[in-house]
């Protein structure tokens, strides 16, 4: 985990500019839900706007389910994808309930697609480390249905980086996975099995 100063400044400047034009952070829980469970307070989606009605991506950052490394692990990817015309969201999740929060984020975007001007039927789930596990897990159709029901389509793709998640199922979305041969977090041999 490494913060690139110039990239971080570029991201903050972009969010500042966008924040003057449109909403850049969407809480995914209602005020009533937050009153009942204050841990939901800062949970939500940063929005990097792409083209109107283009597909969207949700980025789930790593942090070993100990912290949320959005600035260095998700924001750079979201910025790049939005500059290519795709709508990109970065999920700020609770480390105690990451899968619940990702499912809620998917539902939130699906339910608010008209307001957000995104194509609700075409999306991808991205993640690094712990976030990759989240993306792969909710990219599985059976798991997705168990969280959100049958109304929301499965993601078109899952993009996973540096995680040892090696479960495979016929219900998984098409998946791209990458790790480095010198990665100290995960053994590359684990991913070859996937």
Regions found by a protein language model. Give the residues of each.
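Short beta-strand element of the alpha/beta-hydrolase
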Residues: 54-63, 176
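Glycine-rich His-Gly loop
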Residues: 60-64, 163, 180-181
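N-terminal cap/lid segment of alpha/beta-hydrolase-fold proteins
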Residues: 1-52, 141
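Short alpha-helix in the alpha/beta-hydrolase fold that links the catalytic acid
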Residues: 173, 187-194
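Serine-hydrolase catalytic-loop signature spanning alpha/beta hydrolases and amidase-signature enzymes
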Residues: 64-67, 88, 108
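Short amphipathic alpha-helix adjacent to the substrate-entry channel of hydrolases
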Residues: 70-89
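Primarily recognizes the serine-hydrolase "nucleophile elbow" in alpha/beta-hydrolase
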Residues: 100, 104-172
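Short beta-strand/loop motif that positions the catalytic acidic residue
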Residues: 171, 176-179, 183
């Amino acid at each position: 985990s490494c913060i690139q100063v110039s990239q971080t400044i570029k991201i903050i400047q972009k969010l500042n500019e966008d924040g003057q034009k449109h909403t850049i952070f969407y809480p995914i829980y209602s005020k009533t839900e937050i009153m009942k469970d204050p841990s939901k307070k800062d949970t939500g989606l940063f929005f990097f706007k792409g083209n109107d009605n283009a597909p969207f991506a949700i980025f789930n950052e790593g942090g070993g389910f100990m912290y949320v490394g959005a600035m260095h692990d998700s924001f750079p990817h979201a910025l790049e994808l939005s500059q290519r015309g795709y709508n990109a969201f970065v999920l700020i999740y609770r480390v105690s309930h990451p899968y619940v929060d990702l499912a809620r984020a998917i539902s939130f975007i699906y339910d608010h697609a008209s307001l957000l001007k995104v194509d609700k039927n075409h999306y991808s789930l991205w993640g690094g480390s712990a976030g990759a596990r989240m993306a792969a897990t909710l990219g599985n159709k059976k798991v997705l249905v168990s969280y959100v029901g049958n109304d929301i389509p499965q993601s078109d793709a899952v993009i996973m980086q540096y995680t040892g998640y090696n479960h495979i199922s016929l219900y998984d979305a098409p998946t791209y996975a990458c790790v480095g041969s010198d990665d100290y977090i995960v053994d590359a041999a684990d991913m070859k099995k996937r």
